[in-house]
Regions:
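Acidic, metal-coordinating catalytic segment for phosphate/diphosphate chemistry
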Residues: 1-26, 96-97
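Short connector loops at helix/strand junctions that flank enzyme active sites
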Residues: 17, 45, 100-104
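A short coil-to-beta-strand element that immediately follows conserved catalytic motifs
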Residues: 72-83
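Conserved Nudix-box catalytic region and its N-terminal flanking loop in Nudix hydrolases
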Residues: 26-74
């Protein structure tokens, strides 16, 4: 098999250890959280891996938002933040052997008001809009909680 075919087969088999985290919020700082279907009780913002090594991060962010919530409106903003974290052992089988860390890139998606959400039943069980501090407390992921706690800073910025 040519090396490019091996690379393509490899990327089709394993998740890419680069992802986006999208904090969906209203002007009043209400934040959308969704509950994982594979881990009931685990609440998070929209997140997902790149589909291809060359997929632009904003494209991945919009794709994940649409897939996981059905939301297709709002103003996406790259917060220019990234976190490298250890992949939970329960999910490491999704990545190539030896991959233990993921780099997560944070975006904010400002929506005009609380919007209805259409969940992918395969991925999520429920959704809730919460004030930003309560949303941060409910997140199972420390990096997700930390990103939400920075929301007021990013909403206050022009642009």
């Amino acid at each position: 098999m040519p090396s490019s075919a091996v690379s393509e087969a490899h990327s089709a088999t394993f998740k890419i250890p680069r992802s986006v985290l999208v904090i969906i919020h209203t002007p009043e700082l209400d934040v959308l959280l969704i509950e994982r279907a594979d881990k009931p009780g685990y609440w998070q913002s929209v997140t997902g891996s790149l589909d291809a090594e060359d997929e632009p991060l904003p494209v991945a962010a919009w794709r994940e938002v649409a897939e996981e919530t059905g939301i297709t409106e709002g103003k996406l903003r790259d917060w220019d933040l990234s976190t490298v974290y250890e992949i939970y052992p329960v999910w490491r089988h999704r990545y190539a052997p030896g991959v233990t860390q993921n780099t997560e890139h944070v975006f904010g998606l400002g929506v005009p008001h609380i919007l209805p959400v259409t969940l992918s039943a395969r991925e999520h069980l429920a959704s809730v809009w919460l004030p930003w501090q309560a949303a941060a407390e409910r997140c199972f992921s420390p990096s997700n909680a930390q990103a939400i706690l920075q929301l007021p800073r990013f909403v206050a910025l022009p642009g």
